[in-house]
Amino acid sequence: HWMFKDMPTYDWFHQFPGYKQSNYRMTTQYDKNGSKIDAKLCMDGWFVPSMPDLNQSNPLVLNYLTQNAIWWIEYADLDGFRVDTYSYNDKEGIAKWTKAITDEYPYFNIVGEVWMHDQAQISYWQKDSPIAKIQSYNSYLPSVMDFTLHDVFGNVFNEDRADWSNGMIK
């Protein structure tokens, strides 16, 4: 990848011998009995070959991402960010980044894409989540995309009949 030609540090990106794609096993991020190998590959594997995975456990990377976000907020007078694939990031790193941004800009909104279809799983990533608190974790994320609601709307508005078990009445 072209970004590897002049890295600021040797560990700026997650690197493996050969290409390693994420296994997309997001539930490993909060399952205390989940496989540590699966959790690491979910967080550290690349999402796709064209998107190198930044090593957010590297303090220099995290500082760069924070400064870059602040620059964009100031330069473009932004009110919020949508963070794609929020739950694939280094869990502690993304929480530090989110807290740094919201501490600096208390009214700034960050919406995290957590593409899961269960409210309990999605709520883990919400700021001050009682579920995440069980593991002493707080993402500091003000808003999480509600894919459970997305799924319901997709079904409701695409069903031909409206009765007790279909469509809007359901």
Map each language-model feature to its residues.
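Core domains of carbohydrate- and sulfate-ester-processing enzymes
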Residues: 1-51, 150-170
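Active-site-proximal helices and loops of the catalytic beta/alpha 8
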Residues: 2-8, 68-70, 74-79, 85-170
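Short N-terminal helix-initiation segments at or just after the protein's N-terminus
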Residues: 23-28, 55-56, 128-133
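Generic alpha-helix detector with strongest preference for long hydrophobic helices that associate
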Residues: 35, 42-46, 50-53, 74-82, ...
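Short hydrophobic/aromatic-rich motifs at helix boundaries and adjacent loops
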Residues: 39-42, 66-72
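Active-site mouth loops of central-metabolism enzymes
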Residues: 51-64
